[in-house]
Amino acid sequence: MGTLSFALAAAATATAASPLHTALKAGGGTMCFARSYDDAWLSNHKGQTVREARFLVTTSRTSGRPMLRLKVAGNGAPIYGYGECAWHDGDLNRGGQNDILDATFKPTTGVGCHLYTDVDGYSAEEGGDFPVEWVDGGQAIQAHLPDSLAGWRSLDVSRNAAFHPLGPADRIIRLKLAPAAECDELLRRFAPAAEMDDI
């Protein structure tokens, strides 16, 4: 995937009341999206190894930006990712050179997310971008993850994230809005103090 002009896009959308910001406000600054796959599903979807996914979006306490914490679990230890998201109106799924980030993703309006390789903003290495379809007014989302996901294999974020390959069957995940309790681990145990407000 290409590199999204994320900082500019985030700045442009931060001043407007986007559907993402409106939904976050209605949820008290927190939105949890979750999905689990049982053995029957996996047996009918050959190649898929992801069994569970959680996306937690919270409003930064100081900047007001939508911050992202995610968990993708399948074979081996889960992958935990950290970044931020922004609403895009008409230019979703476009990189810095106006290139298409993911050819399988068709909507042009929705949520664009950017992952980091650390939780304090000091790393110069980018963590990757991916588009997210906003479904039924935020009652569900469909994430088109990159083929290499920046993240940690534990809750320890003292070192920079590594890149973990995702197969084609694991990259598109549809999650439903869930009670905040389903993302409690991400909220309370995964980089709980991180804000990225100085980036």
Regions found by a protein language model. Name each.
Residues G27-R65, E126-V135, L177, M196:
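Short, solvent-exposed loop/hinge segments that bridge or flank secondary-structure elements
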Residues T15-C32:
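N-terminal helix-cap/turn-to-beta initiation motif at the start of protein domains
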Residues Y122-I199:
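Glycine-rich, aromatic-bearing surface loops/beta-hairpins
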Residues N44-G90, P146-W152, H164-R171, E182, ...:
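N-terminal glycine/threonine-rich, aromatic-flanked beta-hairpin/loop signature
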Residues G29-T30, Y82, G110, A180:
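Disulfide-stabilized extracellular ectodomain repeats and their linkers
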Residues M1-A9:
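Bacterial N-terminal signal peptides
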Residues R65-L145:
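Contiguous, well-ordered beta-strand patches that form the walls/edges
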